[in-house]
Amino acid sequence: MEERYSRQIRFKQIGEEGQKRLADSHVLIVGAGALGTAGAEGLSRAGVGTITIIDRDYVEWSNLQRQQLYTESDAKLRMPKAMAAKEHLSAINSEIHIEAYVTEGTAETLEPLIEKADVVIDATDNFETRMLINDLAQKTKTPWVYGACVSSQGMFMTVIPGETPCLSCLFEQIPVGGATCDTAGIIPPAVHIVSAYQQAEALKLLTGQKEAIQRGFVTFDVWNNSHMKINVNHVRREECPSCGANAVYPYLQDWNTPKAAVLCGRDTVQVRSESLKRIPKQELIKRLKTIGKVEANAFLLHIFYEDFRIVIFNDGRALVHGTNDVKEANSVLARVIGL
């Protein structure tokens, strides 16, 4: 181990003891897009013993510009991101354990994963999942690192339950969000800077150096050469529904878990269906073949229908590309599959 990590061990803030702690650590990465792949690669090379990745999507050609683990072969095969990431990370470091889950991040799927993790890295692309992470991290007392980037801008904040403001506190005071990678684009340097900060914060936490973390909200614009750190200690709220004295964890409630959602900027609707989940895969393929050519791998099915492109995952989710109307997406699935 010493030869592989020799340069890292020479960094006195880590050393041999810190390297051993990393080997015994477990990091959960929620999302395997640009931030998720950068963070997963960096932490795997650093020797974090167990890395768990959860992601609901598959590799597309537009991902290759900034999502560093993936290859053209992954895009051609429409490989689920979590599985492709696991394969590439295992080739980078065979000494560590990689777990991959091809499913949506919901309260049900995320809670058992967060309970096992020492640190959670936020690499999601939507507000709802971030707030789920926030509530679950508060509930399980798990530290996590928020991160987001779009265009040439990026931001991050480390959240330690019981010590720092949570994301719900922050969003009450600081407007965050708006544009997305799909609407405003993104350049890789913005991704790499946010991910580098997230990795550094994770290494500090995993090696027991909580005193070294960034105590604030950091935002920057790599194109316009701006960088700002905001002191957010004052935004922590005693009455916060997520981290206050009488927390109720609002984003863990069923009413905050929609069965269908428009994916921002992608002209795509995701539909979750228990009925779809119960149909045997071979039966589903048989039905779809009456409509057109079915492409399949171990994790998903793909078919074109009229002006729509439909991708069906093993966990009962379907992506209907070509619409941003939930009713239309449900209607398409009803015609194609009979739901």
Swiss-Prot record:
GO biological process assignments: Mo-molybdopterin cofactor biosynthetic process
One GO cellular component, as annotated: cytoplasm
Cofactor requirement: Zn(2+)
Pfam families in the record: ThiF
Residue numbers binding ATP: A34, D55, S62, N63, L64, Q65, R66, K81, D125, N126
Coiled coil: none
GO molecular function: ATP binding; metal ion binding; molybdopterin-synthase adenylyltransferase activity; nucleotidyltransferase activity; sulfotransferase activity; thiosulfate-cyanide sulfurtransferase activity; ubiquitin-like modifier activating enzyme activity
Cofactor note as given: Binds 1 zinc ion per subunit.
Pathway of action: Cofactor biosynthesis; molybdopterin biosynthesis
The entry's keywords: ATP-binding, Metal-binding, Molybdenum cofactor biosynthesis, Nucleotide-binding, Nucleotidyltransferase, Transferase, Zinc
Residues where Zn(2+) binds: C166, C169, C240, C243
Assigned EC number: 2.7.7.80
Record SUPFAM superfamilies: Activating enzymes of the ubiquitin-like proteins
Reactions accelerated catalytically: [molybdopterin-synthase sulfur-carrier protein]-C-terminal Gly-Gly + ATP + H(+) = [molybdopterin-synthase sulfur-carrier protein]-C-terminal Gly-Gly-AMP + diphosphate
Function: Catalyzes the adenylation by ATP of the carboxyl group of the C-terminal glycine of sulfur carrier protein MoaD.
Summary of subunit composition and partner proteins: Homodimer. Forms a stable heterotetrameric complex of 2 MoeB and 2 MoaD during adenylation of MoaD.
Protein family (similarity comment): Belongs to the HesA/MoeB/ThiF family.
Protein name, entry field: Molybdopterin-synthase adenylyltransferase
Source species: Bacillus subtilis (strain 168)
Gene, per the UniProt record: moeB
